[in-house]
């Protein structure tokens, strides 16, 4: 085995439907959640911007992760749910291709969560400018489907 980085050769693999779903959670202050629900965030509609950012990020995965293949995505769906202690993001990605789309789903979820943090950081800081309560957690692939060859 080489210590050199190299992209996996997928040229001999069949093109089939690939789907992946990932999710993650951002813990927020109750006041921030209330502001999001009431659309009182200075930067705009948090849910809309986070969904848009996640979709854009999924399409850029191969530019961010050097050994990922450039996959022609057919659908990216971002579902964002406000919960008691924060926001859950779930991303589902589909493509007909030779390799899976789980990294695209993870990137979509991660960037959606980071976008939420960016948009609400003003409200999450404590008196010292720190974020003792805010936390992104539990990012994982929750489903992966590969159509039979």
UniProtKB/Swiss-Prot annotation:
Pathway stated in the Swiss-Prot or TrEMBL entry: Cofactor biosynthesis; molybdopterin biosynthesis
Q: Which reaction does it catalyse?
A: (8S)-3',8-cyclo-7,8-dihydroguanosine 5'-triphosphate = cyclic pyranopterin phosphate + diphosphate
State the Gene Ontology terms under molecular function: cyclic pyranopterin monophosphate synthase activity
Going by the record, the broad EC class of this enzyme is lyase
- Please name the InterPro entries in this protein's record: Mo_CF_biosynth-C_arc (IPR023047), MoaC (IPR023045), MoaC_sf (IPR036522), MoCo_biosynth_MoaA/MoaC (IPR050105), Mopterin_CF_biosynth-C_dom (IPR002820)
Q: Where is the active site?
A: 118
What biological-process GO terms show up in the record?
Answer: Mo-molybdopterin cofactor biosynthetic process
SUPFAM superfamilies annotated for this entry? Answer: Molybdenum cofactor biosynthesis protein C, MoaC
Q: Quote the Gene3D superfamilies the UniProt record gives.
A: Molybdopterin cofactor biosynthesis C (MoaC) domain (3.30.70.640)
Question: Which annotated residues bind substrate?
Answer: 67-69, 103-104
Q: What is its EC number?
A: 4.6.1.17
Lyase among keywords: yes
Task: Supply the alphabetized keyword list.
Answer: Lyase, Molybdenum cofactor biosynthesis
| One Pfam match | MoaC
Provide the function of this protein: Catalyzes the conversion of (8S)-3',8-cyclo-7,8-dihydroguanosine 5'-triphosphate to cyclic pyranopterin monophosphate (cPMP).
**Quaternary structure, from the entry:** Homohexamer; trimer of dimers.
Q: Which family does it belong to?
A: Belongs to the MoaC family.
Q: Which PANTHER family match?
A: MOLYBDOPTERIN COFACTOR SYNTHESIS PROTEIN A
Q: What is this protein called?
A: Probable cyclic pyranopterin monophosphate synthase
